[in-house]
């Protein structure tokens, strides 16, 4: 009932747009003047062209609008490449284990087949830049958050437009040859990466930690990495189902974005406390 209430209350407040091949929904605050903007990137299950699933698939964008009704919340939908979720996994299985963080596997986004490819996210950022030039958005307060494939999309988008964002939160970001390289060479944008202590993409944590260690050794104090514990996940009913196999537990733990969207450890407060060209609030 709570989920239905959130959908009914906020979904219709997201206006549908299609611009330069980008399908997106925008929550527009009633406040006058320049407002902050939060860009939300969905996961792999919400790709498509219906311009709706990115809102209803995980409710992430709706939760953000509920929390920050005085900000713009932008929720683009990544292209499907004419592949459904199961079809995508079948293609990935032919390349290797779809749940491994294999740096040798060419990700879909490199080939432009599906997801947050560089050309598409560049078009998304162009829309935001136009909103800034039109005086709608505060150029010093543009934020970025995404989950799973969208977490990898956060790293992709930062690499495409490093000057645009004040801070970002990649949640359980997919790790492949592209997203790992983007994290290794992360531009100077504050990021707080989160994931569950166990996740369905095995070795995800090892690659994230390896990249973070490199950044920390370079003096990047603006990079944070948190693994949610079993106890923290259980507070939100994640991983508590009786009789789960290890594979099923991994899959359930992948819902760790629920914690971030509930501001666990103050992660959302941390994100919006940043402003470009200013010290952290």
Give the ranges of each region predicted by the language model.
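C-terminal catalytic histidine-bearing segment of alpha/beta-hydrolase fold enzymes
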Residues: 194, 198-200, 206-209, 216-281
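Short, proline-enriched alpha-helix->beta-strand connector loops that line the catalytic pocket
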Residues: 69, 185-191
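Active-site machinery of serine-nucleophile hydrolases
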Residues: 37, 44-121
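Alpha/beta-hydrolase-fold catalytic nucleophile elbow
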Residues: 76-77, 145, 171-172, 194, ...
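The conserved beta1-alpha1 loop
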Residues: 41-43, 195-196
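Short, solvent-exposed loop/turn and secondary-structure capping segments
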Residues: 49-53, 84-89, 156-157, 180-183, ...
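Primarily recognizes the serine-hydrolase "nucleophile elbow" in alpha/beta-hydrolase
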Residues: 129-134, 139-185
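A domain-start/cap signature at the N-terminus of enzymes
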Residues: 1-37, 71, 116, 120, ...
């Amino acid at each position: 009932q709570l989920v239905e209430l959130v959908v009914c209350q906020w979904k219709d407040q997201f206006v549908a747009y299609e611009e330069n091949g980008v399908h997106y929904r925008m929550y527009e605050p009633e406040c006058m003047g320049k407002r902050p903007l939060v860009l939300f990137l969905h996961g792999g299950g919400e790709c498509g062209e219906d311009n709706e699933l990115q809102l209803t698939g995980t409710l992430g964008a709706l939760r953000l609008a509920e929390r920050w009704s005085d900000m713009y919340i932008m929720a683009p939908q990544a292209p499907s490449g004419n592949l459904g979720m199961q079809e995508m996994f079948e293609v990935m299985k032919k390349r290797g284990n779809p749940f491994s963080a294999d740096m040798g596997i060419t990700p879909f986004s490199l080939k432009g087949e599906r997801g947050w490819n560089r050309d598409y996210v560049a078009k998304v950022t162009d829309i935001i830049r136009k909103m800034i030039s039109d005086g709608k958005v505060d150029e010093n307060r543009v934020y970025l958050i995404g989950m799973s494939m969208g977490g990898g999309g956060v790293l992709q988008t930062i690499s495409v437009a490093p000057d645009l964002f004040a801070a970002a939160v990649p949640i359980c970001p997919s790790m492949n040859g592209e997203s790992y390289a983007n994290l290794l060479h992360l531009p100077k944008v504050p990021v707080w990466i989160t994931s569950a202590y166990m996740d369905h993409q095995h070795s995800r944590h090892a690659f994230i930690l390896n990249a973070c260690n490199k950044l920390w050794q370079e003096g990047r104090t603006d990079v944070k990495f948190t693994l949610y514990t079993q106890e923290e996940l259980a507070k939100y009913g994640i991983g508590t189902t009786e009789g789960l196999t290890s594979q099923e537990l991994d899959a359930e733990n992948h819902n760790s974005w629920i914690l971030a969207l509930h501001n666990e450890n103050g992660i959302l407060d941390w994100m919006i406390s940043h402003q470009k060209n200013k010290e952290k609030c």
